[in-house]
């Protein structure tokens, strides 16, 4: 799950850069929403893994 959260976080960051750069100004609000959703999923995933006692896979 952490892998998916990181993947979608990267996709959201790329969409945000394109949206805020003027290339796709209509997608900026969608990129903001996606970014914060997957940022929250990343934090939740890190907390759950920490509580289970497992460290991140390297």
From Swiss-Prot:
<feature type="transmembrane region" description="Helical">
    <location>
        <begin position="4"/>
        <end position="24"/>
    </location>
</feature>
<feature type="transmembrane region" description="Helical">
    <location>
        <begin position="28"/>
        <end position="48"/>
    </location>
</feature>
<keyword id="KW-1133">Transmembrane helix</keyword>
<comment type="similarity">
    <text>Belongs to the UPF0391 family.</text>
</comment>
<dbReference type="Pfam" id="PF07043">
    <property type="entry name" value="DUF1328"/>
</dbReference>
<keyword id="KW-0472">Membrane</keyword>
<protein>
    <recommendedName>
        <fullName>UPF0391 membrane protein ABO_0024</fullName>
    </recommendedName>
</protein>
<dbReference type="InterPro" id="IPR009760">
    <property type="entry name" value="DUF1328"/>
</dbReference>
<keyword id="KW-1003">Cell membrane</keyword>
<keyword id="KW-0812">Transmembrane</keyword>
<dbReference type="GO" id="GO:0005886">
    <property type="term" value="C:plasma membrane"/>
</dbReference>
